[in-house]
């Protein structure tokens, strides 16, 4: 499944690899990869495969789930499709409470004591997913864990998720993606090395000249 999803993401352009011409993230960090999983919304077969895969992850790891929660905004559509497949209630969680109306951070019902699984599109440092988890916990929900489409497998993300005491599972990951990209001839040996070095320490730009 990991390599299948990675292949889909590469084929539709949801993931770009440019180790020789790095992207600059909003944080200012240089990166050889850019991921925009919103593009999966435009490809019915891809999004259906993703929904089925996320459902499998949830059933395997969080079988007692009662509510599916999407992260705003990228996780909302996938959460909706998964909740529909599983015939479960769904809500979504904003990055912060609204500044008007009722000031809701959680939209839809997520009641005290309910067992919730968070659906996220991408795990990088884990920040947005953890914000979602914390809001649900503050509302009295029991957060079973997180499922996502893709993870960069960054140590910073793993450490934050562990510190937040939340389990996280992804359909595909950075390792599978680089392997598939190499198999497809998208990247060569030199590019593969740069990608591997970046993941070890993204903040150290020495990978650019690796």
UniProtKB/Swiss-Prot annotation:
> Which annotated residues bind orotate?
124
Pfam families under this entry?
Answer: Pribosyltran
The protein's matches in CDD domains, at most eight in alphabetical order, are given as: PRTases_typeI
Asked if the Swiss-Prot or TrEMBL record annotates the protein with the keyword Transport, the reply is: no
Please give the InterPro entries that the UniProt record associates with this protein: OPRT (IPR023031), Or_phspho_trans_dom (IPR004467), PRibTrfase_dom (IPR000836), PRTase-like (IPR029057)
Q: What cofactor does this protein call for?
A: Mg(2+)
Instruction: Give residues annotated as binding 5-phospho-alpha-D-ribose 1-diphosphate.
Output: 94, 98, 100, 120-128
Q: Which GO terms describe its biological process?
A: 'de novo' UMP biosynthetic process; pyrimidine nucleobase biosynthetic process
What is the catalytic activity of this protein?
Answer: orotidine 5'-phosphate + diphosphate = orotate + 5-phospho-alpha-D-ribose 1-diphosphate
EC no. given is 2.4.2.10
Q: What class of enzyme is it?
A: transferase
Pathway per its UniProt entry is: Pyrimidine metabolism; UMP biosynthesis via de novo pathway; UMP from orotate: step 1/2
Q: What does the UniProt keyword field contain?
A: Glycosyltransferase, Magnesium, Pyrimidine biosynthesis, Transferase
Q: Name one GO molecular function term.
A: magnesium ion binding
SUPFAM superfamilies with a match to the protein in the record: PRTase-like
By sequence similarity, the record places it as follows: Belongs to the purine/pyrimidine phosphoribosyltransferase family. PyrE subfamily.
HAMAP family recorded for this chain? PyrE
> Briefly, what is this protein's role?
Catalyzes the transfer of a ribosyl phosphate group from 5-phosphoribose 1-diphosphate to orotate, leading to the formation of orotidine monophosphate (OMP).
Q: How does it assemble?
A: Homodimer.
Put simply, this protein is called Orotate phosphoribosyltransferase
Q: Which organism is it from?
A: Bacillus anthracis
């Amino acid at each position: 499944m990991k390599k299948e999803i990675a292949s889909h993401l590469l084929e539709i352009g949801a993931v770009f690899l440019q180790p020789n011409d790095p992207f600059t993230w909003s944080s200012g960090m240089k990166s050889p990869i850019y991921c925009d999983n919103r593009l999966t919304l435009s490809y019915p077969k891809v999004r259906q495969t993703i929904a089925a895969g996320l459902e499998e992850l949830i059933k395997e790891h969080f079988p007692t789930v009662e509510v599916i929660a999407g992260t705003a905004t990228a996780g909302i559509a996938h959460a909706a499709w998964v909740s529909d497949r599983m015939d479960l209630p769904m809500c979504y969680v904003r990055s912060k409470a609204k500044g008007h109306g009722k000031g809701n951070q959680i939209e839809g019902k997520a009641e005290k004591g309910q067992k919730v699984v968070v659906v996220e599109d991408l795990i990088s440092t884990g920040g947005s997913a953890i914000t979602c988890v914390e809001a649900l916990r503050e509302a009295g929900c029991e957060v079973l864990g997180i499922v996502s489409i893709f993870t960069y497998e960054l140590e910073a993300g793993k450490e934050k998720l562990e510190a937040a005491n939340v389990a996280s599972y992804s359909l595909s990951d950075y390792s599978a993606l680089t392997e598939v990209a190499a198999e497809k001839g998208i990247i060569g040996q030199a590019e593969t090395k740069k990608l591997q070095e970046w993941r070890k320490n993204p903040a150290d730009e020495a990978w650019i000249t690796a």
